[in-house]
From Swiss-Prot:
EC number: 2.7.4.10
Gene designation: Ak3
InterPro entries: Adenyl_kin_sub (IPR006259), Adenylat/UMP-CMP_kin (IPR000850), Adenylat_kinase_CS (IPR033690), Adenylate_kinase_lid-dom (IPR007862), ADK_active_lid_dom_sf (IPR036193), AK3/Ak4_mitochondrial (IPR028586), P-loop_NTPase (IPR027417)
Subcellular location(s) of the protein: Mitochondrion matrix
Protein name: GTP:AMP phosphotransferase AK3, mitochondrial
């Protein structure tokens, strides 16, 4: 097996709608590593009312971004508990100061970057419409309503969430690019950036899978044998 006995320290990056969540869950299903999502970690700490959770909530409540040092403390505190396993960081580091702070404590072996054209992401994210009363979700591409803009069951109008409106999506994608471009350049210079480009998650995944086979042991679950 190409995977060495050394524990893998990995990061996954990708814009909202790039399929990062799907790829991350497939990685943890097939390989012996722990997936650490900064968003999940944040919610968990806020729910438990930890010191860092309370601090983070004060920024969120004011509509502000959580400062780099708070996010770094949050991630490093959790990573301290994961000394015996390989891990995949998702959502952190998101800025250059976060990447540099992480670097002082851990040597990152590989950064998986999902490079999906913004136009494709925009189509994915803006295709979602919902029926507010029931929470029913329609996707114009994969699961469209029988009549455009109308709920199948009630005949009531569908709405588009603020987050899914084209102008909001474009703003989010531009903000992501501005924030993460320096991080990608930083890891590129270190020689650990692996970029996987494509328009479909199912076509990108086999390349990510082959790459990780050389880096980390696969899970020995029987499920991988069954079709």
């Amino acid at each position: 097996m190409g995977a060495s006995g050394r524990l893998l320290r990995a990061v996954i990056m990708g814009a909202p709608g790039s399929g990062k969540g799907t790829v991350s869950s497939r990685i943890t299903k097939h390989f012996e590593l722990k997936h650490l999502s900064s968003g999940d970690l944040l919610r968990q700490n806020m729910l438990q009312g930890t010191e860092i959770g309370v601090l983070a909530k004060t920024f969120i409540d004011q509509g502000k971004l959580i400062p780099d040092d708070v996010m770094t403390r949050l991630a490093l505190h959790e990573l301290k508990t994961l000394t015996q396993c390989s891990w995949l960081l998702d959502g952190f580091p998101r800025t250059l100061p976060q990447a540099e702070a992480l670097d002082k404590v851990y040597q990152i072996d590989t950064v998986i970057n999902l490079n999906v054209p913004f136009e494709v992401i925009k189509q994915r994210l803006t295709a979602r419409w919902i029926h507010p009363a029931s929470g029913r979700v329609y996707n114009i591409e994969f699961n469209p309503p029988k009549t455009v803009g109308i709920d199948d069951l009630t005949g009531e109008p569908l709405i588009q969430r603020e987050d899914d409106k084209p102008e909001t999506v474009i703003k989010r994608l531009k903000a992501y690019e501005a924030q993460t471009e320096p991080v990608l350049q930083y890891y590129q210079k270190k020689g650990v950036l692996e970029t996987f480009s494509g328009t479909e998650t199912n076509k990108i995944w086999p390349h990510v899978y082959s790459f990780l086979q050389t880096k980390v042991p696969e899970t020995t679950q029987k499920a991988s044998v069954t079709p």
